[in-house]
Amino acid sequence: MAQFCILGVLLILSGTHCSWGFHEETHYPCAFIDTANITGSYGLDGPFVHNWTVIPRHFVAVYDFVIENGIRIPASRHLRACVCKTKPCVRICCLRGEIYDLEKRQCLVPVAGVSSLPSHSHMEVELGNGSLRLVKLQPRFSIHVETPCEHMKAVTKGSEYVHWTLHENGTISHRGHIFSKHYCFTPLLHGNSTWEWQPLACAPEKLYFVLGVREWTYAICLLIAILSMFIVLMVYLMCSEMRNSFYGVAIKAYAICMILGYALLAYLTLHNPANLSNAACRILPSLALMNLVLSFYILSFIAFKLYLSFYGVVFTKLMFWLIFTPIVLVAVGWSFFVGFSYYGSRLIFGGDTCWFDPRNWSVMIYFYAPVFVACAISGFFYVLSQIYIRDQPDIETEKSFESIEKNRFKSFWKYFGYTAVVWVVCICSFAFNYYWENRSHLNYAVSFCMAFHGFAALYALIGKNQQIQNFLRRIDNGEDTCENSVPLSSFG
């Protein structure tokens, strides 16, 4: 068991404090929002030419990142120029003939029956002398047609739109208040009759931390599962007949993984991500992922060994660790990879949530997919075992497959079936929550399944295991159990 503790400590020590919140580097000539990708633009001996605009070389830099939805993400090296430094920029959300729909959060063609849209080529601008004039945009401004963020919102005063003024220098203001650079213009209906150009601001979808009855129920059910797994661990540690067997060691390793994984999930559920450091918000979920994924591959390892038991294969201590160590390293490597990977423009761990973001499908790819692979491997060996049992005469089967191993086989697969049901419920619950836009991994079905998982471990791994039951009877009768201790030379 010391080896498992060492592996956990090594993973913690390998985590590094990586602040992923974006800040502008001082060696870039301007803010990212003021730049445009000019890769492929014509470069003279001195300046560059982009969209018929001459850009001095000191406004050009090589970037190895882009910013999407306010988040900096790595990108291939490319040239960007401060086009808004050369000519004031005006950002329009959608192409000609389209408007940005605030409810559907995308560019759409307006429904028929409304008045025609205002021209994209002209807009009312306040000139330097203070006068307002409808001017053609192209000669005076660099026009960008895009939304700077995935979700945009209108800035209103009460329920009324604010009349923002576009200035000749590209700024937008209202009574001394300057609008953010992260904006785009779109026509919006004013009074259900006329269109008015309105700047929209970035509205990132914030996933707020909630600690309610549902979260506490989930945490309590996880605690029940943890206590159940702890009982399984203690019983298998005390049982001399199980202590040094392959099956006993594997079950103990599995119980440790489940205890640590569920404990970390409970901790993350009850703690606001805003109160955790960036490093903690990356390392803790990575550790939880490692333990949970590793637990499923331990079950696959047990299924493999139970199948080999039909052929009388006995694992030595060296064989056990030669097979088990790569499994641990793969789980550690996978969790480390996920902890520093992006899903779309967001880090998988960190930000609004310190677990998988329920607003996307990252949990299906990085958690449930490897779990499914482990279950498929286990199922494969279960099918092979059943084929072997079916093909053997009843008498020969009893001779070649000892009753102890047969009992382990039945109790293990009973528990595996319960485990599969629990995680199928978790997957289906997430899919339903996602479909109904309930941005959470949790519901009461998931919570109660966690408690059921703990009770299933007690029932199948202790209640249905004949060796454990015999050991508990000897304990109850006050018999000495140490005399049956087996040296750790081979794993049966």
UniProtKB/Swiss-Prot annotation:
Its main location: membrane. Keywords: Cell membrane, Disulfide bond, G-protein coupled receptor, Glycoprotein, Membrane, Receptor, Signal, Transducer, Transmembrane, Transmembrane helix. Residues 22-218, 267-282, 339-362, 433-441 are extracellular. The keyword Methyltransferase does not apply. One of its GO terms (molecular function) is G protein-coupled peptide receptor activity. It is a multi-pass membrane protein. One of its GO terms (biological process) is determination of adult lifespan. Disulfide bonds join 30-82, 84-89, 93-184, 94-107. Pfam families: Methuselah_N. GO terms for cellular component: membrane; plasma membrane. Coiled coil: none annotated. Residues 240-245, 304-317, 384-411, 463-492 are cytoplasmic. Glycans are attached at residues 37, 51, 129, 169, 192, 275, 360, 438. Residues 1-21 form the signal peptide. Gene3D superfamilies: 2.30.160.11, Methuselah ectodomain, domain 2 (2.170.180.11), Rhodopsin 7-helix transmembrane proteins (1.20.1070.10). The keyword Signal applies. The chain crosses the membrane at residues 219-239, 246-266, 283-303, 318-338, 363-383, 412-432, 442-462. It is found in: Cell membrane. Belongs to the G-protein coupled receptor 2 family. Mth subfamily. This is Probable G-protein coupled receptor Mth-like 8. It comes from Drosophila melanogaster. The gene is mthl8.
